């Protein structure tokens, strides 16, 4: 199962962590995994490359985990929150369609 955690800090999303494999299908044919990967890459690329936010991104191949953490001060906070909220809504819709393969939660 893929586990997605959005970090909540005072009502704003301060980052996310995505880990695990969905197990929906074999590697290369797993539409759940492909959808999660696309949402994560879109959000991370938009935040760092388009908006220019110096977010910290860590990838742990052994744990199949990617974590993105925003800096404490962010000039384009509204845009970043819109991107992360869109990512969260997209992944929640995916979870609703495939509840056995992905979980999405907000953590403090």
Predicted regions and their residues:
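Short, conserved glycine- and acidic-residue-centered signature motifs
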Residues: 32-36
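N-terminal intrinsically disordered, cationic/polar leader segments
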Residues: 1-31, 41, 45-108
